[in-house]
Curated annotation (Swiss-Prot):
Protein name listed in UniProt: DNA mismatch repair protein MutS
Source species: Aliivibrio salmonicida (strain LFI1238) (Vibrio salmonicida (strain LFI1238))
UniProt gene name: mutS
Upper taxonomic lineage: Bacteria, Pseudomonadati, Pseudomonadota, Gammaproteobacteria, Vibrionales
Role of this protein: This protein is involved in the repair of mismatches in DNA. It is possible that it carries out the mismatch recognition step. This protein has a weak ATPase activity.
Keywords, ordered alphabetically: ATP-binding, DNA damage, DNA repair, DNA-binding, Nucleotide-binding
Biological process, per Gene Ontology: mismatch repair
Gene3D superfamilies, sorted: 1.10.1420.10, 6.10.140.430, DNA repair protein MutS, domain I, MutS, connector domain, P-loop containing nucleotide triphosphate hydrolases
């Protein structure tokens, strides 16, 4: 917007341009009456983003002014659209009185809505965290800070590499990201909405410490354990300053800052989070994910907490066993069924408290807070049955808070209006002075009814009515047919098509009295509303602790229900290396299958640290690998797992190299993506890591791919000693267990009958004897003629015939001849592979079901 000088503009446009100059990089919603208007480039941009009309408002300084507008009562919907697109908006309100203003009404920016700092319900995803973050980079080191303004959770970390920084961005998924003007690794910021460039000085360490100490009311940061995290503090300082600037108010609910230490967590890189489909599937949706299966929480704040747990599995066995003990108690006594309906009535207290802290809570927020507090006595009654220590701690924090509940019951009407603007929020009887002025204003109805009746009878005018509108105030209306009966002291105020409107001294006096009393009542109510905030805010910390306790109680109760309903078992956690799972199942796949899921065991230990997995495509290799990782992840979240039994050793990281696609935006081929992920694993995996490697080397020539797969497997097995599941189509790799200790071959079974194949999905010891690739191609719908040609070519290759030798017509004709010897049936082939002595009762029953299905 090129504006040389404001002198040539109208006073109103001068005011607009001054406010716009204070907020140059974001959209300015400028309040004019019942509309928010945008001008110049803001109007053009908003018309594109919101698909609203672009018009012109006269001219200023001799040029037409582009303009776009939207009604104030619908602003939340438009803000939601802008926030979703990563835009920020300055909300400019009229704060002066138009009746007394000389020149333009006084206006000022009262808040700035940004993607990471929104607290309004309409603008927030209900069951997902909404984080704002800041990133700092210096000499290869990173500082990273995140803030959830709706809860006050403020964290810093110091990722040591670009890979770990990328993993943190993937885990936290901030909707707004602040970075300095001299930030170098800008590729980390690609494909993100809500990036905000900030001045370099905002990231200075001394400035950051000053900002943080001011926020927490402390002299130093030693008590928070972050004083040595200088890079993290640089990011945190910029972040807290930005949030203060946008909110235009104090932030009393942000009282501490926490160091997010990688040593306490099982680290998941970006590829692993994507491949395991924890909260988002590979297509970007939310169905068929781990969280969809596990998240039956009763409250939105519980749902958000569960997702945080899933994305940050922990290594602290004391905490994990504490969670498992709590789930076990809730499951064994069935108490989760009693808690669930009570928790549903409590709602999203966490975000209500954030709006309370920012003094932006609306009347219905406080009504919902009151309703939540009214549920606590019944919840306390249910929690009396608790015995487990952690459950008792949570119950003690969720006890009734009678003083606040009683205050809100006295103060707020049962069903208040949406906003305080027009009053009618505070309950009758809450304040004597307010009641008196309300009674005076409400007495108008009786007065008007009485006046109307008296005037009708006195002047014999049966069409006479007393009414009111915002423009003309109170009036007496008489139809045109009877207007000749209007007495002389009736002063005509307005002529309509079919009626005349008049005013009389008594009505005018009453109008002044009523409007004065309404205005006085509204002023008193708004003052009392602000005082109500003052009474509630000293209890904010207690209320937040209550909300946190209820969130965790909701998650634990939910996980108990899931464990009971889905037949999960309690994992045994160990500090030893390895894992032993009997009857393991994929938590997501088993829920979407119509047939019974084939459970499989896995055993990894010091003598068996790598499994070379072979078998057909579609045989279940990837499912088997993913279910192992998901069971390990769930155990480190502290929840029950889909298995008959599970002993899980200590993990520091989970890596997955499963599937790949071209990264066209970065100019990386499928093979380049695969090798980048493989390099990350080979550099960062340890003996405490769980590594999933699926089909390494597919994207290049056979010998290159085989060589890379062999070398990678050998390195993992001999140098790193990581617990590894290594799926491959290179049968040469099945020789590795003969060459190195700690390796074993397993395969997923399949039965071929004629041109058909049945996948048994059962993991067997030893290597597969063939790949069944042509059978899978046939299942996929490859034309039969192509399959026949492929079979003939395969036979040539297996018999050592020259690769360029053509098939003869005689050979092709032979394909159509019938065999005189009947082929064994599919069931017979499957039965021949079953060894009854190797089967447990459950496996025998599953085998019987599979054989039955083949008939």
């Amino acid at each position: 917007m090129a504006i040389k000088s404001t002198e040539k503009h109208t006073p109103m446009m001068q005011q607009y341009l001054r406010l716009k100059s204070e907020n140059p990089d974001i959209l300015l919603f400028y309040r004019m009456g019942d509309f928010y208007e945008l001008f110049y480039d803001d109007a053009k941009r908003a018309s594109q983003l919101l698909e609203i009309s672009l018009t012109k408002r006269g001219s200023s300084a001799g040029e037409p002014i582009p303009m776009a507008g939207l009604p104030y009562h619908a602003v939340e919907g438009y803000l939601a659209k802008l926030v979703q697109q990563g835009e920020s908006v300055a909300i400019c309100e009229q704060i002066g009185d138009p009746a007394t203003s000389k020149g333009p009404v006084e206006r000022k920016v009262v808040r700035i809505v940004t993607p990471g700092t929104v607290t309004d319900e309409a603008l927030l995803p209900e069951r997902f965290d909404n984080l704002i973050a800041a990133i700092y980079h210096h000499k290869g080191q990173f500082g990273y800070a995140t803030l959830d303004i709706t809860s006050g959770r403020f964290k810093v970390s110091e990722p040591s590499t670009e890979e770990s920084m990328l993993a943190e961005l993937q885990r936290t998924s901030p909707t707004e990201l602040l970075f300095s003007e001299d930030f170098e690794p800008v590729h980390l910021l690609e494909k993100r909405n809500g990036n905000r460039r900030r001045p370099v000085w905002e990231f200075e360490l001394d400035t950051a410490k000053q900002q943080l100490n001011q926020q927490f009311g402390t002299r130093d940061l030693v008590g928070f354990g972050v004083e040595n995290a200088e890079f993290g503090l640089c990011a945190a300082g910029c972040l807290i300053q930005y949030v203060k600037d946008t909110q235009r108010t104090t932030l009393p609910h942000i009282r501490s800052i926490v160091m997010d230490r990688q040593d306490d967590s099982v680290i998941l890189d970006a590829a692993t989070r994507r491949n395991l489909e924890i909260t988002q599937n590979l297509a970007g949706g939310f169905n068929h994910t781990l969280s969809e299966v596990l998240d039956h929480t009763s409250t939105a704040m519980g749902s958000r907490l569960l997702k945080r747990w899933l994305h940050q599995p922990i290594r602290t066995h004391d905490v994990l066993n504490q969670r498992l003990d709590a789930i076990g108690e809730l499951k064994s006594n069935g108490l989760y069924a009693e808690l669930s309906p009570q928790l549903k009535q409590i709602g999203d207290v966490e975000r209500i408290l954030a709006r309370l802290a920012l003094r932006s809570a609306r009347p219905r927020d406080l009504a919902r807070l009151r309703n939540a507090l009214q549920q606590l006595p019944e919840l306390a009654q249910s929690t009396q049955a608790f015995e487990q220590t952690h459950l008792l701690e949570l119950a003690s924090l969720a006890q009734p808070i009678d003083s606040i509940c009683e205050l809100l019951e006295r103060a707020v009407k049962e069903n208040p209006p949406v906003v305080i603007r027009d009053g009618g929020v505070l309950a009758d009887g809450y304040n004597e002075e307010l009641d008196q002025w309300r009674d005076l204003a409400n007495g108008a109805a009786l007065f008007l009814s009485k006046l109307e009746q008296e005037e009708r009878e006195r002047h014999d005018i049966d069409t006479l009515k007393v009414g009111y509108n915002n423009v003309h105030g109170f009036y007496i209306q008489i139809s045109k047919g009877q207007s000749h009966k209007a007495p002389a002291h009736y002063v005509r105020r307005q002529t309509l098509k079919n009626a005349e409107r008049y005013i009389i001294p008594e009505l005018k006096a009453h109008e002044d009295k009523v409007l004065s009393s309404k205005s006085k009542a509204l002023a008193i109510e708004k003052k009392l509303w602000e005082e109500l905030f003052d009474q509630l805010l000293p209890h904010l910390e207690q209320l937040q602790l209550m909300a946190n306790a209820i969130s965790e109680l909701d998650v634990l109760s939910n996980l108990a229900e899931r464990a009971d309903t889905l037949n999960y078992c309690r994992p045994t956690l160990s500090s030893d290396i390895g894992m032993k799972i009997e009857g393991g199942r994929h938590p997501v796949v088993e829920q979407v299958m119509s047939d019974p899921f084939i459970a499989n065991p896995i055993n990894l230990n010091d003598d068996r640290k790598m499994l070379i997995i072979t078998g057909p495509n579609m045989g279940g290799k990837s499912t088997y690998m993913r279910q192992t990782a998901l069971i390990a992840l769930m155990a480190h979240v502290g929840c029950y797992v889909p298995a008959d039994s599970a002993h899980i050793g200590l993990l520091d990281r989970i890596f997955t190299r499963i599937g790949a696609s071209d990264d066209l935006a970065s100019g990386r081929s499928t093979f380049m993506v695969e090798m980048t992920e493989t390099a990350n694993i080979l550099h960062n995996a340890t003996q405490h890591s769980l590594v999933l490697m699926d089909e390494i080397g597919r994207g290049t020539s056979t010998y290159d791919g085989l060589s890379l797969a062999w070398a990678s497997a050998e390195w993992l097995a001999t140098k790193i000693n990581a617990m590894t599941l290594f799926a491959t189509h290179y049968f040469e790799l099945t020789e590795l267990p003969n060459l190195f200790s700690g390796l074993a071959n397993v395969h997923l079974d399949a039965v071929e009958h004629g041109d058909e194949i049945a996948f048994m999905h059962a993991v067997q010891e030893g290597a597969a004897n063939k790949s069944y690739g042509l059978a899978v191609a046939s299942l996929a719908g490859v034309p039969k003629a192509v399959i026949k040609k492929a079979k003939q070519k395969l036979q040539q290759l297996e018999n050592g015939q020259p690769k360029n030798q053509s098939l003869t017509s005689t050979q092709i004709k032979q394909e159509h001849q019938l065999s005189l010897i009947p082929e064994p049936s599919e069931v017979e082939e499957a039965l021949a592979k079953v060894n009854p002595d190797d089967l447990s009762p459950r496996q025998a029953l599953e085998a019987l079901y599979r054989l039955k299905a083949l008939l």
